[in-house]
Amino acid sequence: MPYPMQLGFQDATSPIMEELTYFHDHTLMIVFLISSLVLYIIILMLTTKLTHTSTMDAQEVETIWTILPAVILVLIALPSLRILYMMDEIYNPYLTIKAMGHQWYWSYEYTDYEDLTFDSYMIPTQELTPGQLRLLEVDNRVVLPMELPIRVLISSEDVIHAWTVPSLGLKADAIPGRLNQATLTSTRPGVYYGQCSEICGSNHSFMPIVLEMTTLKYFEKWSSMMQ
């Protein structure tokens, strides 16, 4: 859930987002150590009175500062590639939905059902009720079962959009004529917000995404009512 003046990530709601958070901390630790070392060397050079004017080369030092960055890059690349393959892996999804971007709203189709489609528009500020979030609420939420793998097919009817839900670690481009796919699995029930993350025109900021993750029993009841 996002909140005002937030600096960190939203609480992770999917295994992928948890892995991304761990990877962020891992990379940030490496960056902090490198920055601290560089700052220490700069301060040492500015404050010391010792000079080494006779040194022409230093093979040992050059070897170290060649091998060490390569090792650091490997330590960053390996977990990154692991998460990349995890995000791309889709095995036996319980449900498939199609998200189509428009200027400026989203339309959804539950492909496993005969007639379950709807458009999702942002609720204008003047129509919000107490407790609803400005610029994030929609008239039709995407209801999905939690703890089950869901495949999302993403495309666009006009210009390039991006379907993004930060707490689930999801961001996929919606490109006209191209079908991208993503997978999501929520570990707990709740309402999760996202927005179009690709500048798509004058109302780009007004096409939010709202996912309502619920129990399988409630989802089946909701889907039968919507058809």
Swiss-Prot record:
Reactions catalysed, semicolon-separated, are:
4 Fe(II)-[cytochrome c] + O2 + 8 H(+)(in) = 4 Fe(III)-[cytochrome c] + 2 H2O + 4 H(+)(out)
Instruction: Report the EC number(s), separated by commas if there are several.
Output: 7.1.1.9
User: What is said about its interaction partners and assembly?
Assistant: Component of the cytochrome c oxidase (complex IV, CIV), a multisubunit enzyme composed of 14 subunits. The complex is composed of a catalytic core of 3 subunits MT-CO1, MT-CO2 and MT-CO3, encoded in the mitochondrial DNA, and 11 supernumerary subunits COX4I, COX5A, COX5B, COX6A, COX6B, COX6C, COX7A, COX7B, COX7C, COX8 and NDUFA4, which are encoded in the nuclear genome.
Q: Provide the GO MF annotations for this entry.
A: copper ion binding; cytochrome-c oxidase activity
Main location (coarse class): mitochondrion
Full protein name: Cytochrome c oxidase subunit 2
Among NCBIfam families, the record links this protein to:
CoxB (TIGR02866)
> Which residues are on the Mitochondrial matrix side of the membrane?
46-59
Gene Ontology CC annotations of this record: mitochondrial inner membrane; respiratory chain complex IV
Q: Hey, what's the signal peptide range on this chain?
A: none
Task: Give residue spans on the Mitochondrial intermembrane membrane side.
Answer: 1-14, 88-227
Role, per record: Component of the cytochrome c oxidase, the last enzyme in the mitochondrial electron transport chain which drives oxidative phosphorylation. The respiratory chain contains 3 multisubunit complexes succinate dehydrogenase (complex II, CII), ubiquinol-cytochrome c oxidoreductase (cytochrome b-c1 complex, complex III, CIII) and cytochrome c oxidase (complex IV, CIV), that cooperate to transfer electrons derived from NADH and succinate to molecular oxygen, creating an electrochemical gradient over the inner membrane that drives transmembrane transport and the ATP synthase.
Q: Give all Phosphotyrosine modified positions.
A: Y218
State whether keyword ATP-binding applies: no
Q: How does it sit in the membrane?
A: Multi-pass membrane protein
Instruction: State the compartments where it is located.
Output: Mitochondrion inner membrane
Q: Where are the transmembrane segments?
A: 15-45, 60-87
Q: Where does Cu cation A2 bind?
A: C196, E198, C200, H204
What are its GO biological-process terms? ATP synthesis coupled electron transport
Point out the gene that encodes the protein. MT-CO2
The record's comment on cofactor binding reads: Binds a dinuclear copper A center per subunit.
The record lists Mg(2+) as bound by E198
Q: What family name appears in the similarity comment?
A: Belongs to the cytochrome c oxidase subunit 2 family.
* Cofactors demanded by this protein: Cu cation
